[in-house]
């Protein structure tokens, strides 16, 4: 029997995904502050009288006590900080919150932890609820943060090919994830505007709490979406399905009279 078997852990966590199993149990994927992404089982949580009923819904943010079973962690206790269930009442909020959870699930392996990314996700939920931030700009910022956290951050300081120092660029190399100087070959690169280059650089460095201060033009937001969607699609093992929903939402907003 391993040393971790029946070891008890208490950690702050956000529920990024759930799946019903059996009559009263469900699988719950937690993105935790201490243990990273873990798969758990919440026994009896589908019963309305269960103390886990209201704390094991998707988007819930709280403190969870878990122990390691033979194959999964088991949720033993939970204390809710914020359920974020109000996000279910707005299609836009629901879609973006679901996307952030899905992207976190795709980008992080089981047991892989990042306190920084955990803070980004929690902050994003509060910002979505506040409606004080442009949600597209928030999404692009979160994407840049998660790319950097998982080793796919963009290089803004040196040419991706010759390593010459650069301050801005018009072409982004898709394989080496960096700008290309004027002299180097532009094959396997994407042209971007100066404004989009500046936005990428700024959003990569800004704190999540200050995203509400950023104002971007519609053209820049569209180009950011294309660039980051492509980078995410080519670097993670699968493309988030929510991206397609986001595209439909954006198109819907454009066609509003």
Curated annotation (Swiss-Prot):
InterPro entries, per database record: ARFGAP/RecO, DNA_rep/recomb_RecO_N, NA-bd_OB-fold, RecO, RecO_C
DNA damage in keyword set: yes
Pfam families xref list: RecO_C, RecO_N
SUPFAM superfamilies: ArfGap/RecO-like zinc finger, Nucleic acid-binding proteins
GO cellular component, one term: bacterial nucleoid
Biological process, per Gene Ontology: DNA recombination; double-strand break repair
Keywords on record: DNA damage, DNA recombination, DNA repair
Purpose: Involved in DNA repair and RecF pathway recombination.
Entry similarity comment: Belongs to the RecO family.
Name of the protein in question: DNA repair protein RecO
